[in-house]
């Protein structure tokens, strides 16, 4: 019997996704839990597993096409298809409705367990599980985000739910991984690009990729919502240059690639603490300002697929070396398409580095709902006046954009001056803790 597999809700609050790459084709024999496709949403690339074993009859959605949750994307000739009818979007939605109408007795029995989970489980965590497993967890009163998956790529199975009910493993050690081959974007472009008749001015057209749509939406929303003001400045970083040179070899001995960026992260965190208005969110509709008592720094990363912003969490608690390692790891994940949505959430302020591309000053766009973004340009040798003499020194270009609804010009410049002071004399960062 043919089993119609529908694009499932992957738990990110996203209702559609672009089919980036199929790993199967008509005629292939597959096993349950084999990866069928990679789907890209606004946040990340996610692997979609098969809920059944069988033979692929037909792939219904081409690579590069956007499918909506619930759409049939592939048909599989599965011997147990009749028993598997509950798997997929439809039944999952029905079970959600049933939950709202009545509470399960099992859930009442597990209430003490659930209350404990609420204090320990990261509710924003991405879960890999089929709809049937999610339903099974709900029926047994288990928060699926507290369960450690033992399946392929950390996928959660019914056996994992049973083990959890019997006092087994929790979410500790659970990992969500996504994979994306560098050639996938080429495949999408090749399939989506259509050549028009040749002439004096030949053109081609292609569908806008999901990632580019997400970036465009975020940029337009930020510029339309927040009145941007950008301050541009520069600072002599000779001592910073020498400090990094002094510790570069020491860092390398322990496997750390030391760059200037971790220094900027620490300087920005210090500025956010001294001028907390920059570490807020401005909600005009609700009439509220959200004050954030944590310091997570987003690092804008340029990739082949577009701009991604992985986040260094609790940057105030980490050393220069630790931040350097984390930035390098996140950058590799970004380039390889392996960032999870969790690694791109929770930033309180962002850094954009145009200097790595040879740029100097620019007007970085705020990563809404944040209220500020620090842009760093290249370090260039320039003439400066020092002790009454003109000398050459390495000078760093800085650009600070902020939301003028929340931050006044003087506050923005004072924050910029504080950052300049720390980068001019990096030993002061030791005094910051």
From Swiss-Prot:
Its cofactor is (R)-lipoate. It comes from the Bacteria. Belongs to the 2-oxoacid dehydrogenase family. Signal peptide: none annotated. One of its GO terms (molecular function) is dihydrolipoyllysine-residue acetyltransferase activity. InterPro entries: 2-oxoA_DH_lipoyl-BS (IPR003016), 2-oxoacid_DH_actylTfrase (IPR001078), 2-oxoacid_DH_E2_comp (IPR050743), Biotin_lipoyl (IPR000089), CAT-like_dom_sf (IPR023213), E3-bd_dom_sf (IPR036625), PSBD (IPR004167), Single_hybrid_motif (IPR011053). The modification N6-lipoyllysine is found at residue 43. This is Dihydrolipoyllysine-residue acetyltransferase component of pyruvate dehydrogenase complex. PROSITE patterns: BIOTINYL_LIPOYL, LIPOYL, PSBD. It is an enzyme of class 2 (transferase). Binds 1 lipoyl cofactor covalently. Its EC number is 2.3.1.12. Residues 84-103, 117-126 have a biased composition (Basic and acidic residues). One of its GO terms (cellular component) is cytoplasm. The pyruvate dehydrogenase complex catalyzes the overall conversion of pyruvate to acetyl-CoA and CO(2). It contains multiple copies of three enzymatic components: pyruvate dehydrogenase (E1), dihydrolipoamide acetyltransferase (E2) and lipoamide dehydrogenase (E3). Keywords: Acyltransferase, Lipoyl, Transferase. Residues 166-188 have a biased composition (Low complexity). Residues 80-134, 164-204 are annotated as: Disordered. Forms a 24-polypeptide structural core with octahedral symmetry. The active site is at residue 404. Residues 128-165 form the Peripheral subunit-binding (PSBD) domain. It catalyses: N(6)-[(R)-dihydrolipoyl]-L-lysyl-[protein] + acetyl-CoA = N(6)-[(R)-S(8)-acetyldihydrolipoyl]-L-lysyl-[protein] + CoA. Residues 2-77 form the Lipoyl-binding domain.
